C-alpha cells in the first residue's frame, strides 16, 4: 500500500504551506502558498540572508521615500522567496498583498499589479503566480478587476459560503477556505463537543462550498487551507487543492492506511441546492449574521497586518545597518 500522501495526490492537488523553500523542495507538492507570517519565520535565517539583503538593496536603489522604500523591499522579499520556491515545484506559488489594504479596493488593485509586474521583471512566469487578496467585499471587487487584467487571484481568509459565492461571481481563479480557524472558533465558543471528523465545522464549511461550486459548474478552484490535523485533510480528499503544512505532509507520508475520496463532483450535482442571488447588501447582511466568519476574517486581517509590521520593523533595522555601513 502506498502512503496516504501518494494516495491523496491522486484525488487532490497537494500544496505546501510554508515560507521555507527547502521545506517546499522536500514536500513533493505541486504548488506552494506563503504569507507574511510564514516568511517572517524564515526570512532572517542565515541560509536565506542573500534573498533578504538583495531585496533591501533593490528597494534602496528605487530612490523612493522611506515609506516607498519599505513597500518596495517587502514586495521584493516576497518575490525573491516566491521565485526560490518555484525552483522546487512544477506548479504555482501564492504571494500576498499587504493586509492593511483589505478595505481599499483601488489600493489592492495597484499593489497586486505592482507585485505581479515585479514578479515578471525579476524573471517569474506570471502564469505561475497567484496573488492573495482577502475575502472582504472590497477585496473581492479588486479581484474582479485584476482577473480581467490577467492577474490570477487567490481569495484568502474565506470562512463561509457567501464569501465563496462572491469570489466566484468575481471570477476568482481560486479561493482558500480556512478549515482549522473555523474549527478553532467553534471550540473556543462552545467547547470541545467531541465532533466526529465528518461533523467538524471547518470540514463541513468546505464541503458546503464544494457542493455549491460543483452543483452550478463554477470554475473557481477550492484550495482548503489552515488544517489542524491529518484527519481534517483526509476528510476533504477530493477537494480541488489542499494546502498543508510540512508537518502534516510528513504525517501523511508515514501512514499507509487507505484514503477514501470524500468530495465528489457527481455526488454534489445530485444534491438539492438553491442558487444565491448576490448583492453587496446581501453579502454584508449574511456576513453580519455569521459571527464566526465576521470574527475570524477580522482576526485574520489583524494577524497578517501585525506580522507585516513586525517584518517591516526587521527590514527597517537592516536598512539602517546598510546605511550606516555606507556612511
Swiss-Prot record:
The keyword Ubl conjugation does not apply. It comes from the Bacteria. Keywords: Cytoplasm, Pentose shunt, Schiff base, Transferase. One of its GO terms (cellular component) is cytoplasm. Its EC number is 2.2.1.2. Pathway: Carbohydrate degradation; pentose phosphate pathway; D-glyceraldehyde 3-phosphate and beta-D-fructose 6-phosphate from D-ribose 5-phosphate and D-xylulose 5-phosphate (non-oxidative stage): step 2/3. It is found in: Cytoplasm. The active site is at residue 132. GO terms for biological process: carbohydrate metabolic process; pentose-phosphate shunt. It catalyses: D-sedoheptulose 7-phosphate + D-glyceraldehyde 3-phosphate = D-erythrose 4-phosphate + beta-D-fructose 6-phosphate. It is an enzyme of class 2 (transferase). One of its GO terms (molecular function) is transaldolase activity. SUPFAM superfamilies: Aldolase. Pfam families: TAL_FSA. InterPro entries: Aldolase_TIM (IPR013785), TAL/FSA (IPR001585), Transaldolase_1 (IPR004730), Transaldolase_AS (IPR018225). Transaldolase is important for the balance of metabolites in the pentose-phosphate pathway. Belongs to the transaldolase family. Type 1 subfamily. PANTHER family: TRANSALDOLASE. Homodimer. This is Transaldolase. The gene is tal.
